[in-house]
Curated annotation (Swiss-Prot):
GO terms for molecular function: ATP binding; magnesium ion binding; phenylalanine-tRNA ligase activity; tRNA binding. Belongs to the phenylalanyl-tRNA synthetase beta subunit family. Type 1 subfamily. SMART domains: B3_4 (SM00873), B5 (SM00874), FDX-ACB (SM00896). It catalyses: tRNA(Phe) + L-phenylalanine + ATP = L-phenylalanyl-tRNA(Phe) + AMP + diphosphate + H(+). GO terms for biological process: phenylalanyl-tRNA aminoacylation. It is an enzyme of class 6 (ligase). Residues 39-148 form the tRNA-binding domain. PROSITE patterns: B5, FDX_ACB, TRBD. This is Phenylalanine--tRNA ligase beta subunit. Binds 2 magnesium ions per tetramer. One of its GO terms (cellular component) is phenylalanine-tRNA ligase complex. It comes from Salmonella paratyphi A (strain ATCC 9150 / SARB42). It is found in: Cytoplasm. Mg(2+) binds at residues 454, 460, 463-464. The lineage of its organism: Bacteria, Pseudomonadati, Pseudomonadota, Gammaproteobacteria, Enterobacterales.
Length: 795
């Protein structure tokens, strides 16, 4: 929002300069974006009157004038402006005047005629870009008066960024209130006395959508002169706020908008059929707006209509059919309070953003409408003449915003700001802000003013108190906090520890969106039900993820497209699985997932280029699982997953419960996702692993360990993990280690079979094992394998 500093000082005039005022406004939360003078630097320009105006004898486009500037004689000045005429009051740069750009006025001859000055346009004085003609001043402008003084050009425009919660500052009155509070200065409101009705004319007004329009005021003003010129003082105030003067009626409504923050609209009363109806639009209904464009409306759009058609979009844009034009004599002034939710988003839907919609979307003071319509009526009558009828008020108190009582506790105030502000200061600040305050024991009960929608809870009052008290007035104090030993279960395995291990192994952590493309997700989890968002950011982000693989694989593709072929990444996050038994019907599981692809090692002269395989990822995953202390209970079992290669994947089980998957991405899925080369993934349900087994101290055997190797032949479909597990189970008391060190297929082994070479480590903590005992345990293992898996010792 942009406004004139002098206009603000008409409302409140603290004894501080422009820089201090701008800094104060910024510190109050209304960030000042810029302060600029309203005119260029010049002097020697005064009010004059064109007494004579004749055609230049030697130039068709020049005129020779005699100008009275209040001196002893008339000045001869040559002027080329098309609007120069006898009797016009003008801005005259006299000899010796210095204009913007260090341009000095001197006596000269133009085409043979003497010129003792210059009649100035707005652009020549650095006031605006208007160079279409010389400045036309009011007829009562006093001759010889310095133009800077007459037009009050020793002024600045201040532009501020108003946050959405401070809609009350979208008018001079709101900024003035804040400045008055900060400086403990009185607020000097211009007189806005009620206008006495001189005619009885009214217009029927019906509000069918009371929830969207709790208050609608109208007033008939008859017999106006719509072509009456807008006073220069009003034009200047509008210009300094960035508003172009259009006609007197529109200028008045814009003036009230800027002054009070209340949007208004003027209808041509004679073009309204029957009366005003405030209603919701009919689906597909059209209205031609003031800019000539046609808008097709939805049923959730509030409109101002007459008895036959829509006249405009409520709170956003008026319609062409009922707009004021050069022949208008009778107008209906509209001043309403619209519920912000009934306006929000409607302007953007039609590609519009108006000053009215900007304010209505954020909220207008529901108690402001009477003051605004009285102010507009008085200005309109003073400028355009005419007679005003009574105010037509259609209000629904039940749907108007209610002011809640907010309790502010002393303990909360002190705790949040870390500083004690005296009780009387707190009470004074709240009252100066416009609150109705009741003081209690170590608390205040405050009712926020109608213009402050953002004051709803206790924290809002704390913010207001410290804002007005001044952040700079809060002393720097060392932070004081009690040191309390945090409780941490030894069995808790921190994800931070897991992430550190993966980082050490060359993985990089990524964070991907929980919103994924439902089509891609169906490729990874065909047939799985996912939660679809009713209002997604985009179609490609309209489903909640069922696993972390969607985001991770998309990240791999992104990197491969940028010549990053060796990728090792992981992510921790939630998946969202529809579950009727879960709270709100959605189960949220914390997952740990990772992806690798490309070469096993970074390029190096001493290392061969080898592509990662299943066992690279399995080894990394086992290192992570070992942190849980449950690696001995983990099994990798062949199990189908539609996203994984059927021959290079496995389900991960903790005892008898499946906790994840690992494997190579299915070749068909690789093709559809545009993955380049073999890609391997894993995913674990972390909640089932977060409780680690705390290592138990035990005696280290002083007696020698014994290793025995066996090679058994089993069917191809027998998992090696089951063989190792069986050996551990059989030799539970003496077998302390089992390891698979070779797998052989080929000569000497029948087709459909494989040879597994297993080492058994046998040891006792109390004595040295005898050879007979060792042989018996090995034989027991072989017998168990033969019985369960039909295994045989390889010759």
């Amino acid at each position: 929002m942009k406004f004139s500093e002098l206009w603000l000082r008409e409302w409140v005039n603290p004894a501080i300069d422009s820089d201090a005022l701008a800094n104060q406004i910024t510190m109050a939360g209304l960030e000042v974006d810029g302060v600029e003078p309203v005119a260029g630097s010049f002097n020697g320009v005064v009010v004059g009157e064109v007494v004579e105006c004749a055609q230049h004898p030697n130039a068709d486009k020049l005129r020779v004038t005699k100008v009275n500037v209040g001196g002893e004689r008339l000045l001869d000045i040559v002027c080329g402006a098309p609007n120069c005429r006898q009797g016009l009051k003008v801005a005259v740069a006299t000899i010796g005047a210095i204009l913007p750009g260090d341009f000095k006025i001197k006596a000269a001859k133009l085409r043979g005629e003497p010129s003792e000055g210059m009649l100035c346009s707005f652009s020549e004085l650095g006031i605006s870009d208007d160079h279409s003609g010389i400045i036309e001043l009011p007829a009562d402008a006093p001759l010889g008066t310095d133009i800077r003084e007459y037009l009050k050009l020793d002024d600045n425009t201040i532009e501020i960024s108003v946050t959405p919660n401070r809609a009350d500052c979208l008018g001079i009155i709101g900024v003035a209130r804040d400045v008055a509070v900060l400086n403990k200065a009185p607020l000097q409101e211009p007189e806005m006395a009620p206008v006495t009705a001189t005619i009885s004319d009214t217009l029927p007004i019906t509000v069918e959508a009371a929830d969207a329009c709790p208050r609608y005021l109208g007033r008939v003003v008859k017999g106006i002169n719509v072509n009456a010129p807008t006073p220069l003082w009003m034009k200047e105030k509008l210009r300094r706020c960035g508003i172009r003067s259009i006609d007197a009626v529109v200028d008045v409504t814009n003036y009230v908008l800027l002054e009070l923050g209340q949007p208004m609209h003027a209808f041509d009363k004679d073009r309204i059929d029957g009366g005003i109806v405030v209603r919701m639009a009919k689906e597909g209904e059209t209205v031609v707006l003031l800019d000539g464009s046609e808008a097709t409306l939805n049923a959730d759009t509030l409109v101002i209509a007459d008895h036959h058609k829509a006249l405009g979009i409520a709170g956003i844009f008026g319609g062409e059919h009922s707009g004021v034009n050069g022949e208008t004599q009778n107008v209906l002034l509209e001043c309403a309070y619209f519920n912000p939710l009934s306006i929000t988003g409607r302007a953007r839907r039609h590609g519009l953003h108006t000053d009215a919609s900007h304010r209505y979307e954020r909220g207008v003071d529901p108690a402001l409408q009477y003051k605004a319509i009285e102010r507009a009526t008085r200005l309109l009558l003073d400028i355009c003449g005419g007679d005003a009828g009574p105010i037509i008020d259609v209000s629904n108190e039940a749907t108007l915003p209610k002011r809640a009582t907010i309790t502010l506790r002393r303990s909360k105030l002190d705790r949040l700001i870390g500083h004690h502000i005296a009780d009387e200061q707190v009470s004074d600040i709240l009252r100066r802000l416009g609150c109705e305050v009741t003081e209690g024991q170590d608390e205040w009960k405050a009712v926020a003013p109608t213009w402050r929608f953002d004051m709803e809870i206790e924290e809002d009052l704390v913010e207001e108190v410290v804002r007005v008290y001044g952040y700079n007035n809060i002393p720097d104090e060392p932070i004081q906090a009690g040191l309390i030993m945090g409780t941490h279960r030894e069995a808790d395995l921190s994800l931070k520890r897991v992430k550190t291990m993966l980082n050490d192994k060359g993985y990089q952590e990524v964070i991907t969106y929980s919103f994924v493309d439902p089509k891609v997700q169906q490729l990874i989890h065909p047939g799985a039900e996912a939660l679809l968002l009713p209002n997604p950011i985009s179609v490609e982000m309209s489903a909640m993820r069922l696993s972390l693989w969607s985001g991770l694989l998309a990240t791999v593709v992104y990197n491969q497209n940028r010549q990053q072929n060796r990728v090792r990444i992981f992510e921790t996050g939630l998946r969202f699985v529809p579950d009727t038994q879960a709270n709100l019907g959605i189960r949220q599981d914390l997952m740990l997932a990772g992806v690798i692809c490309g070469n096993r090692y970074d390029e190096h002269w001493n290392l061969a280029k080898e592509t990662v395989d299943f066992y690279d990822l399995k080894g990394d995953l086992e290192a992570v699982l070992d942190l849980t202390g449950k690696l001995g209970d983990i099994q990798f079992k062949a199990e189908m997953n539609p996203a994984l290669h059927p021959g290079q994947s496995a389900a991960i089980y903790l005892k008898d419960e499946r906790i994840g998957f690992i494997g190579v991405v299915h070749p068909e899925l690789e093709r559809k996702l545009d993955l380049n080369g073999r890609t391997l993934v894993f995913e674990l349900e972390w909640n089932k692993l977060a409780d680690r087994i705390v290592p138990q101290a035990r005696e280290i055997s002083r007696f020698p360990a014994n290793r025995r190797d066996i090679a058994v032949v089993v069917a191809e479909n027998v998992p090696a993990a089951d063989i190792l597990s069986e050996c551990k189970k059989v030799g539970v008391n003496q077998v302390v280690g089992v390891n698979l060190f070779d797998v052989y297929r080929g000569k000497g082994v029948a087709e459909g079979y494989k040879s597994l070479a297993i080492s058994l480590i046998l040891q006792d903590t109390n004595r040295t094992l005898e050879e007979e005992e060792i042989a018996a345990t090995v034989a027991k293992c072989v017998e168990a394998l033969k019985e369960r898996f039909q295994a045989s010792l390889r010759d």
